[in-house]
Amino acid sequence: MSAHTRITRKTVTAIRSTKGIGSLVSLTAYSAPMAKLVDEVADVIIVGDSVGMVLYGMPDTLRVTLDMMIAHGAAVVRGAAQACVVVDLPFSTFQESPAQAYRSAARLLAETGAQAVKLEGGCEMTDTIRFLTDRGIPVMAHVGLMPQQANAAGGFRAQGMDPRSAAQVFDAACAAERAGAFSVVIEGTAEALARHLTETLTIPTIGIGASPACDGQVLVTEDMIGAFDAYTPRFVKRYADANAVMRDAIRQYAHDVRQRVFPEPAHCFGYGKPLQLADAATAA
């Protein structure tokens, strides 16, 4: 690639236009180095509030703050060159009113450089999504299993498994589309429901524990590569065991330090050369 070749970042319009064409690849990232790696293949990078559990050891996502999302979102934007970057609106920063959601979303986009925000919610969020999209803030909706509402739902339980629950998820996704969302994440739902939503909606569906029929898939990267093992959802496929690789490297380093075989000459400056010290008068 020449020095003059310019990489164009995928826009929300481009993402929306993929409906029914191929399959969108989406992963999470919370740092610039991870974003750079994921950016090689991803169409969409989601800076999820899952950062609280994955990086900070929190028991859930409820303690994640807007400032945290801004810091991690900005890092991801710096690391990613071509993927569309979407940042989560964390708990308590958008539920109070559309105006509150706008203030939070405006800060996220202005201070991170991301392309869109993602928010969890059912039909009660319809007015908020419309308020944001009417004011130029692209929104990715999130329906089905919603981690921010896990307490009210009695835990992390699959949704849409009975007719009433399925209707609620279906109505929420359709309402989000009508309100202007450019795509929707469908998490932890009955496969038939996710498939039906994908066939019904005119915006891309991105599944996580949903259906292979969705217009795209997303996983938490640390789950997928085996770097986070505190809890593994049943819908995660592990493609590597990063923890094992890192653990072996750390143990080898500790062994080499204790045996004084690290650092080697190649890791030192002027190894083997005699010490030369200027006297105090000369140095002054």
Swiss-Prot record:
Binding-site residues for Mg(2+), renumbered to this chain: 49, 88, 120
EC number: 2.1.2.11
Cofactor note: Binds 1 Mg(2+) ion per subunit.
Gene3D superfamilies according to UniProt: Phosphoenolpyruvate-binding domains
Chief location: cytoplasm
Subcellular location as annotated: Cytoplasm
Gene Ontology cellular-component annotations: cytoplasm
Record InterPro entries: Pantoate_hydroxy_MeTrfase (IPR003700), Pyrv/PenolPyrv_kinase-like_dom (IPR015813), Pyrv_kinase-like_dom_sf (IPR040442)
Entry keyword Glycoprotein: no
One biological process term in Gene Ontology: pantothenate biosynthetic process
Function: Catalyzes the reversible reaction in which hydroxymethyl group from 5,10-methylenetetrahydrofolate is transferred onto alpha-ketoisovalerate to form ketopantoate.
Quaternary structure note: Homodecamer; pentamer of dimers.
UniProt name for this protein: 3-methyl-2-oxobutanoate hydroxymethyltransferase 2
Gene: panB2
